[in-house]
Design a protein with these regions (language model features):
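Interdomain "pre-motor" coupling segment immediately N-terminal to P-loop NTPase/helicase cores
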Residues: 4-53
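Pre-Walker A adenine-sensing motif
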Residues: 70-84
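Conserved catalytic/switch belt of AAA+ P-loop NTPases
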Residues: 113-114, 142, 158-205
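Conserved AAA+ ATPase "SRH/arginine-finger" region at the nucleotide-binding site
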Residues: 203-216, 223-237
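C-terminal alpha-helical "lid" subdomain
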Residues: 3, 229-290
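AAA+/P-loop NTPase substrate/partner-engagement loops
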Residues: 111-147, 155-159
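Walker A/P-loop nucleotide-binding motif
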Residues: 85-107
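Dynamic helix-loop-helix/coil hinge segments at AAA+ ATPase domain boundaries and subdomain interfaces
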Residues: 10, 50-74
Length: 290
């Protein structure tokens, strides 16, 4: 029998270092002891257990968001109530891509804070950090300000159990959701999970009905549902004209519309995102900064 070769001290030290690093990644971070008193926009950094300030939020003025007036009015009313310390609902903005879901959240936050002394704080939570939400709630619970958590493009795939952490935000578990925290999410899916994932849960669960109900009901835990749908040609052109007027693009109306339609045909779709991309191209061509 061959004797096992002895590891060198250097190799053992390297192995221990890798093990320690792996344990550090698995262990929850120590929470920051204090919340920022200034600033109104942050990103949650779970590996630091703290918030990182965003100096400039890329947002546009509310009047430039066309074809979503009903959604705009509903969301701004809900957000104002929350900012004023009144009851408000968590909101799920779902539907067509590029129709202004995330733009609306940021624009509403900006509008609600206009002229306010105590700003509503917007905190972006990345999709991959959903599992750390209970840590964030623990940090915010003692805060004196009001916090709007925002997750863009939220959905869950097969074998993903982080949706259970989201319930801590929507319902709060045994402690209850802090009164100073609200959660907004955008998603292309109304029920946040693909149908095949729910079908698989039904087939393998001891109690199939309860397994699927748990996942479908995740969307039901949002008190406010706002649907976004593909825009018509008239809506698309209204977006183009509003952008062109706002940024002072000097071009004949007939040419603007014709070129905007050609651009949309080349992209194979009409949406707020496509309209903005056309305006960027046109502004560059005209030598205009926006």
């Amino acid at each position: 029998m061959k004797k096992r070769a002895k590891s060198s001290p250097k190799a053992e030290a390297s192995l221990l270092s890798r093990v320690a690093a792996a344990l550090d990644r698995l262990a929850p971070p120590a929470l920051s002891q204090t919340l920022p008193e200034k600033g109104d926009a942050f990103v949650w950094e779970p590996h630091l257990g703290a918030l990182t300030e965003v100096a400039h939020v890329a947002s546009i003025e509310l009047p430039l968001l066309k074809a979503i007036e009903n959604q705009r009015d509903t969301l701004i009313a809900n957000t104002r109530r929350f900012a004023d310390g009144l009851p408000a609902n968590n909101a799920l903005l779902w539907g067509a891509r590029g129709m202004g879901k995330s733009s609306l959240v940021k624009a509403v936050h900006r509008e609600v804070n206009r002229g306010k002394k105590s700003a509503l704080v917007l905190i972006e939570v990345h999709r991959e950090d959903i599992a750390s939400l209970p840590l964030l709630l623990r940090l915010l619970r003692g805060g004196k300000r009001r916090y709007l958590l925002f997750c863009d493009d939220l959905s869950f795939d097969k074998d993903d159990t982080s949706y259970k952490s989201l319930k801590a935000v929507l319902e709060g578990g045994i402690e209850g959701r802090p009164d100073n925290v609200l959660f907004y999410a955008t998603s292309n899916r109304r029920h946040l999970m693909p149908r095949d994932m729910m079908d698989n849960e039904r087939a393998t669960a001891i109690n199939p009905g309860e397994a699927v109900e748990e996942k479908v009901s995740l969307s039901d835990r949002f008190g406010l549902w706002l649907g976004f749908h593909n825009c018509s040609q008239d809506d698309y052109l209204a977006m183009i004209e509003a952008y062109a007027a706002n940024y002072g693009l000097k071009i004949a109306p007939e040419e603007l519309r014709a070129r905007a339609l050609t651009w949309a045909m080349g992209r194979g779709s009409r949406s707020g995102r496509v309209a903005w991309q056309f305006i960027q191209d046109m502004a560059g061509e005209l030598g205009k900064k926006i």
